[in-house]
Amino acid sequence: KMAKFSKMQVMAAMKETGMVPVFFNKDIEICKNVIKACYEGGVRVFEFTNRGDFAHEIFGELVKWADKECPEMILGAGTVVDAGTASLYLQLGANFIVGPNFNPDIAPVCNRRLVPYSPGCGSVTEINNAQAAGCDVTKVFPAGNVGGPSFVKNVMAPLRWSNIMVTGAVEPTEENLTPWIKAGVL
């Protein structure tokens, strides 16, 4: 299966939605309920994390289900740390790949399919190296431990073209999110 959505559509939806929910559960019915609730709430980009036994099998079924039940939902795979796992999720229909780290072997796998790869980065060098490898969106992870909103703000000064999302110690409260948004996250 090829990605249902183009790289440009994924990027636009990430910006429009303003957040990418991250979730895993071994119970596919719980996953469906969470995805459906997010979809009904206006979310159009969802990251299913590769954090359990047979997670790829659950993801493959969710892609088929979402195609019918949530046709505008852009599903991607997270917690992808190697090129083989990226290839597996791309074959199952992932529209984007996210990792907790930057693995330069994953970038060409995604780039060949024009599928976004958003690696976790914890320094200006990692962000810059990921961008050089074709990563349009980088993820600061673990954001709260790497330096918080001030880190993002300071990175955006010299690398102002960057598209940065954050995960790890980011809470869904106005008090927590406001400084991140002001710092310039995606």
Task: Go through the PLM ranges and name each one.
Residues 2-76, 80-84, 88-92, 161, ...:
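Conserved N-terminal beta1-alpha1 strand-loop-helix module at the mouth
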Residues 3-8, 28, 50-66, 83-87, ...:
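Active-site-adjacent beta->alpha loops and helix N-cap segments on the catalytic face
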Residues 19-23, 46-48, 75-78, 97-98, ...:
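Hydrophobic faces of well-ordered beta-strands that scaffold small-molecule active sites
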Residues 39-44, 90-97, 111-118, 132-137, ...:
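Glycine-enriched alpha-helix->loop->beta-strand junction motifs that scaffold or abut catalytic
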Residues 167, 178-179, 186:
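C-terminal binding/interaction regions
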